[in-house]
Amino acid sequence: MKSTSDLFNEIIPLGRLIYMVNQKKDRLLNNYLSPLDITATQFKVLCSIRCAGCITPVELKKVLSVDLGALTRMLDRLLCKGWIERLPNPNDKRGVLVKLTPDGAAICEQCHQRPGQDLHQELTKNLTADEVATLEYLLKKILP
């Protein structure tokens, strides 16, 4: 009898490969970011908030494709670190908006500068320049 993992790999081999590459990227990113006391997941949340300016947790959940409960806990941790603030939502008396603090913007900028080219080289070290270009082209074709 085949395991669930084996069945999953047979049904969605490309999806599994993309997932595994994403996991590798996150592990590498965590290694690069650890001296700044931030995880890859926290970095993604901060970047999404930075791009939006101010955003509701529900909108952020959709952007990141994560569970709202997990996102709320993440936002609580970022709030404790002083990297975000919660503001009343003027369009919804019960809701809030999240926004980067100056410290949050600064850590986001530091994170952008830190891994950059090193991360790209580590991810693609077994590929030729032509293979990297082809991979980027094909992945962009998959996206809408």
Swiss-Prot record:
Protein name: Multiple antibiotic resistance protein MarR
Lineage top rank: taxon: Bacteria
Domain HTH marR-type span(s) in chain numbering: 11-144
Tagged with keyword Glycoprotein: no
GO biological process per UniProt: regulation of DNA-templated transcription; response to antibiotic; response to stress
Matches recorded under InterPro entries: HTH_MarR-typ, MarR/SlyA-like, Tscrpt_reg_MarR-type_CS, WH-like_DNA-bd_sf, WH_DNA-bd_sf
Keywords: Antibiotic resistance, DNA-binding, Repressor, Transcription, Transcription regulation
Family annotation (SMART domains): HTH_MARR
Pfam family, one: MarR
Record GO terms (molecular function): DNA binding; DNA-binding transcription factor activity
NCBIfam families: PRK11512.1
Primary gene name: marR
Function statement: Repressor of the marRAB operon which is involved in the activation of both antibiotic resistance and oxidative stress genes. Binds to the marO operator/promoter site.
